[in-house]
């Protein structure tokens, strides 16, 4: 094998030596391509696996933790929620519409492959500076393309996109982040797993035909970008949501039968990863007859068939004798279905082309025992330079308030979420635009499931460990503010180039923060994804661990809103304000800096707040609640009253006026009627949570907070109309 071919497959000299040892000979091109894909960062997690191993993954309500297509938790009365968040960053930067659309398609397949009907989607989007003279126009093009791709796929599938977050920073100028989350619901006893066992059981290919799109996608997503990256468009997959809708319905029909052993979607590395993962998990072997693959293009080779990432395809291990019944279901839905192999006990993948053996590879070294790297780490030099920076107010508080509310990181994103169908399936209780976590009704048991997606990249830049812990806490707090109990998380860890020791240090610290927070807050990790090599021309993104928290409220009718719907409601701040300005939005806007330090998270205070919110809502004491986040109580209150029909007369009583922009954790704003005040304050005392009265909601169309005064019309204009102007 010549060195150029090996290098083109991103195989190092050390890895090639391992290949020779595993095979006992030189690989052919097909085998090299397969091994390259399975050992890519995207498929093998070779740089990250050692740090993920310590994640808390168990709890009495966890049915399935990491290692399957998605995580599963018990949501009561025999029902389960199946969910996962995943990235499609690199493809979305290269081809925003197709990249984002297939990102949605992939995460939907991960969930319905487990036997669940998908009932909700969320997304976390990070773009570069839309005001930048050089790249601002391109960033706006990326925003529009990505949003169009997500809405096209989700809307066509009939899956409501009910929430998300969108942030902008120059660190994403060369690498945008597109993280998609899906949640499905099924009976706890009806979950299907990705396994291939039982010697002689048939392996069946179902779904769309295979083309040349997405070739080398997994390897491409395991590398950084440079000027030549524009030529990678052919590696971006092309999605067809209508085919996926047929595939989902066919699979859900199949799941009502007893015909199959296991099922796996064909995602990154296509037929390669699905076959190796199924056999690897089961300790089996497999024969695949590649010439039987349904092909969309003529003249396709075994190499192309194994590595194509054409969308809307699944691999099924059926019970022997049920092949025709399985195929009949998929044919009914106008999909391809063909027996293309069988399970063996050899522990090897045997690849045939017109009955000739063209590839023979041991499965375990490519799946369960793929190489794990121990990359060097070192603390980034910038941390010592930024940690002592102190934020001081330099402009008028009213000016700063207005600047912040109309900033693209805070203002309303109706331009984005209005393109998503959030009400299809008629289960949505709280969707995007209503602040905080999104909520859906589970008709089968009367409960509701709340979900929130969270990632503050600036905080993770300032302190990767505490920043990651804060993401776990913040997502959970948003769920708690709906009245639900946070139960578990899914994570998507977006970082820079792992070959840079400073990036690996950030990643290791981020994992430590997630481990610590999940353990202390009793929200185990049940699924997730790692996206590395988010770097362009040597510049890495800020560390960006995206966390989705999922929780359950037993009675959907008790779901809390985040808006004040009545006048004369008492407005309270819960929790302590500690003067946290490190990595804050107010510092970024006023000083154009991301600096400072972060205080350790007080987990007892965080849990006490969650427990108080749950109990107070169960006792029907609260009218509304919202987590305090970016921009402190100033922005939290401004947004709550912008989406409300009433005005506000509020006083913070802080000694230092800038404290209204403090971003301390473990805080919430609540609204309650005056007759419930005493009972609530007694309960807060019982839980050890400080409650500070800020004022009341009023019938006057006016917003007042300390010295800040705006008419309701001015407040609404700043919040609701700014982004539409900025993105044009």
UniProtKB/Swiss-Prot annotation:
Pathway the protein acts in:
Purine metabolism; IMP biosynthesis via de novo pathway; 5-amino-1-(5-phospho-D-ribosyl)imidazole from N(2)-formyl-N(1)-(5-phospho-D-ribosyl)glycinamide: step 1/2
Q: What is its EC number?
A: 6.3.5.3
Q: For this protein, what is any one GO molecular function term? A: magnesium ion binding
Amino acids binding ATP: 45, 84, 491, 528
Main localization (coarse): cytoplasm
Provide the function of this protein.
Part of the phosphoribosylformylglycinamidine synthase complex involved in the purines biosynthetic pathway. Catalyzes the ATP-dependent conversion of formylglycinamide ribonucleotide (FGAR) and glutamine to yield formylglycinamidine ribonucleotide (FGAM) and glutamate. The FGAM synthase complex is composed of three subunits. PurQ produces an ammonia molecule by converting glutamine to glutamate. PurL transfers the ammonia molecule to FGAR to form FGAM in an ATP-dependent manner.
Q: Which HAMAP family match?
A: PurL_2
Stated family: Belongs to the FGAMS family.
This protein is called: Phosphoribosylformylglycinamidine synthase subunit PurL
Look up and give the organism this protein is from. Answer: Campylobacter jejuni subsp. jejuni serotype O:6 (strain 81116 / NCTC 11828)
